[in-house]
């Protein structure tokens, strides 16, 4: 489940019209969400409150080997945070959890018909207006968190300098570990590409990220290729000035919709030339209540590979919104009645309605001009070709919009998430839902392999409440056991 402060941060980005979908850091966010979701390792309780329209507080408790907790505080001078924030009772489940990310094609200034809030879908018309608004007001966000009993501190400051630029400062301080790290980010987003300059006091690390979007210019006919597909290419470069350790990677992402069903899908291909690691992912919304993801990893140097799968199954509420009662899983193309009857009554004409009638134009030609039969036939063929092509585009666009509207108008009560890896031989199960105003996450990670604990870090071993005893390894047979198990409650007002 998305932590409360992350929900506030998302609301800040939406209120200031900053889109995170252009960030190279989030270029593979969809596959990470479906495959690497976090499993609670203890009993966790989070209580949050919006004390004023601009201040937010959160208190966390967890019981692992001992009682741990943290206290968070956030302040922002953004004026429309309450428009995007919901308490745990009112927030839709698809907005409270991390799930498949539907991207908003860049430079597409058509008005979206969905009303449901999304972490990455901002109103593009507002973005366009903001980019040309000379009265831009700088906004800021201040966040701090203290952990106990360790007394570790973390802080973050975000400053919107202009409609295209943003400055971010993050800091972590740990007295026990004698660790103090400060990281600065300067981001510039032109919609076509986002550039990010990074500097960290840890090893004097310098970094540069860039992500460039292709297929972003609308065509003359507003076709589905330009409106519903996007191709992005990004890269990152790192250098530690103290140790002179370099790092780099590049990723290609393609996002589109199926023109037959309207369902979105995302493809990514990543490459790290220094470590020889290649990764490809395929993520798709297979239905309004199901999602599937597959990931293949391969290393050129060690010849090791891994195949991972993840999926989601959403449970809908039986009583849906009035506009969604008669919806079914079959998505029909645009009806002839909508196409042919009274087109002037609609606010926006369909594309094929803008094609001029060449036959009527010919009839207006003076009778003194004699048009040969073969030219008349050519005019008729052109009229039919343009009209049928644009009609097909309208049908594809209508199918995609119907699928999006079905998701936006659905009320989901719970979701099951599953993820498995063939090399690690693990199975992660997570259930998330709402109960009496609480957002609940409960899950476990099942292990099927002997070498699992040897592959864990010391922190992960300490987090696991259950371990394999010596008797479990008798005869080389290890039973299935839960390496992690926990439940998390969130409540906010």
Curated annotation (Swiss-Prot):
Where would one find coiled-coil regions in this protein? none
According to its record, how does it sit in the membrane?
Answer: Multi-pass membrane protein
List the GO biological process terms: establishment of mitochondrion localization; mitochondrial genome maintenance; mitochondrial outer membrane translocase complex assembly; mitochondrion-endoplasmic reticulum membrane tethering; phospholipid transport; protein insertion into mitochondrial outer membrane
Alphabetical UniProt keywords: Membrane, Mitochondrion, Mitochondrion outer membrane, Transmembrane, Transmembrane beta strand
| Cellular component, GO, one term | SAM complex
- Top-level lineage group: Eukaryota
The record's subcellular location field reads:
Mitochondrion outer membrane
Q: One Pfam family name from the record? A: MDM10
Its subunit composition reads:
Component of the ER-mitochondria encounter structure (ERMES) or MDM complex, composed of MMM1, MDM10, MDM12 and MDM34. Associates with the mitochondrial outer membrane sorting assembly machinery SAM(core) complex, which consists of SAM35, SAM37 and SAM50, to form a SAM(holo) complex.
What does the UniProt function comment say about this protein?
Component of the ERMES/MDM complex, which serves as a molecular tether to connect the endoplasmic reticulum and mitochondria. Components of this complex are involved in the control of mitochondrial shape and protein biogenesis and may function in phospholipid exchange. MDM10 is involved in the late assembly steps of the general translocase of the mitochondrial outer membrane (TOM complex). Functions in the TOM40-specific route of the assembly of outer membrane beta-barrel proteins, including the association of TOM40 with the receptor TOM22 and small TOM proteins.
Question: What is stated as this protein's family in its record?
Answer: Belongs to the MDM10 family.
Free-text note on domains in this protein's UniProt record: Lacks alpha-helical transmembrane segments, suggesting that it resides in the membrane via beta-sheet conformations similar to those predicted for other outer membrane proteins and porin.
- The protein in question is named Mitochondrial distribution and morphology protein 10
Q: What is the species of this protein?
A: Saccharomyces cerevisiae (strain YJM789) (Baker's yeast)
Which gene is the coding source of this polypeptide chain?
A: MDM10
């Amino acid at each position: 489940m998305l932590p409360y402060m992350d929900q506030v941060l998302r609301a800040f980005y939406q209120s200031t019209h900053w889109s995170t979908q252009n960030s190279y850091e989030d270029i593979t966010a969809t596959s990470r969400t479906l495959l690497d979701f976090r499993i609670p390792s203890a009993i966790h309780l989070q209580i949050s409150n919006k004390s004023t329209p601009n201040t937010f507080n959160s208190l966390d408790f967890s019981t692992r080997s001992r009682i741990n907790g943290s206290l968070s505080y956030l302040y922002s001078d953004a004026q429309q945070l309450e428009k995007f924030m919901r308490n745990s009772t009112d927030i839709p489940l698809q907005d409270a959890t991390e799930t498949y990310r539907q991207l908003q094609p860049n430079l597409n200034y058509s008005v979206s018909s969905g009303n449901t809030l999304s972490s990455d879908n901002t109103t593009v018309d507002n973005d366009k207006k903001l980019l040309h608004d000379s009265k831009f007001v700088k906004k800021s966000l201040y966040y701090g968190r203290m952990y106990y009993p360790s007394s570790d501190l973390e802080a973050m400051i975000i400053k919107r300098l202009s409609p295209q630029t943003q400055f971010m400062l993050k800091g972590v301080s740990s007295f026990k570990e004698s660790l103090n790290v400060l990281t600065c980010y300067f981001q510039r987003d032109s919609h076509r590409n986002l550039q990010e300059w990074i500097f960290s006091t840890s090893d004097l690390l310098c970094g540069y990220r860039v992500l460039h979007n292709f297929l972003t210019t609308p065509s003359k006919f507003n076709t589905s290729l330009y409106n519903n597909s996007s191709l992005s290419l990004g890269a990152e470069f790192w250098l530690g000035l103290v140790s002179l350790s370099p790092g780099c990677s590049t990723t290609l992402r393609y996002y589109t919709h199926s023109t037959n069903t309207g369902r979105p899908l995302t493809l990514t291909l990543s490459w790290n030339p220094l470590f020889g690691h290649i990764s490809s992912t395929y993520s798709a919304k297979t239905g309004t209540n199901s999602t599937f993801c597959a990931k293949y990893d391969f290393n050129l140097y060690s010849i090791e590979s891994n195949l991972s799968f993840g999926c989601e199954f959403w449970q809908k509420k039986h009583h849906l919104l009035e506009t969604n009662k008669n919806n079914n899983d079959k998505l029909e193309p645009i009806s002839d009645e909508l196409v042919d009857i009274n087109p002037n009554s609609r606010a926006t004409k369909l594309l094929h309605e803008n094609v001029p009638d060449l036959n009527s134009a010919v009839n207006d030609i003076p009778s003194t001009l004699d048009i040969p039969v073969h030219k008349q036939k050519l005019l008729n063929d052109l009229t039919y070709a343009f009209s049928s092509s644009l009609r097909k585009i309208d049908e594809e666009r209508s199918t995609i919009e119907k699928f999006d509207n079905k998701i936006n108008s659905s009320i989901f009560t719970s979701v099951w998430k599953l993820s498995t890896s063939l090399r690690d031989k693990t199975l992660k199960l997570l259930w998330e839902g709402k109960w009496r105003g609480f957002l609940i996450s409960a899950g476990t990670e099942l292990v099927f392999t002997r070498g699992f604990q040897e592959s864990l870090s010391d922190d992960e071993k300490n987090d696991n409440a259950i371990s394999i005893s010596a008797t479990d390894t008798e005869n080389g047979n290890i039973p299935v056991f839960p390496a992690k198990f926990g439940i998390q409650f969130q409540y906010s007002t």
